[in-house]
Design a protein with these regions (language model features):
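Acetyl-CoA-dependent GNAT
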Residues: 10-11, 17-18, 22-92, 103-105
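Extreme N-terminal starter segment of soluble prokaryotic enzymes
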Residues: 2-5
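Flexible nucleotide-binding loop
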Residues: 96
């Protein structure tokens, strides 16, 4: 496929927030947070998430259509540890390999 995969930055905050809210609304039981909680958060919260996490976005013709989020622990004995805290692909592109591409890019 012709996806572009890259790390999301502060300039992507509106698209990131929209996709995150879509994910929370579509798959309510799959995430630790809720649509209602995240909907009430200011945009600065999402900017901070982009800055403190590695969040890769998958773009299709310039539209953010998928993402994967990773948090690396910061303690001196824990820097080698991290966790994937979320992944979402827009339903129209599910099953097309974007999730695998995001996972592969993150693991490299």
């Amino acid at each position: 496929m012709g996806w572009q995969i890259r790390k999301l930055v502060a300039a992507d905050v509106a698209a990131f927030r929209d996709l995150r809210l879509e994910a929370l609304q579509t798959y309510r039981d799959a995430f630790g947070s809720t649509y209602e909680t995240e909907m009430s958060r200011p945009l600065s919260y999402f900017v901070e998430r982009l800055q403190k996490n590695v969040i890769l976005g998958g773009f299709d013709q310039g539209e953010l259509v998928g993402m994967i989020g990773f948090y690396q622990q910061s303690g001196p004995k824990d820097r080698h540890k991290g966790a994937i805290w979320g992944m979402y692909i827009k339903s129209r592109l599910q099953g097309g390999g974007l999730a695998s591409a995001l996972w592969t890019r993150l693991s490299n």
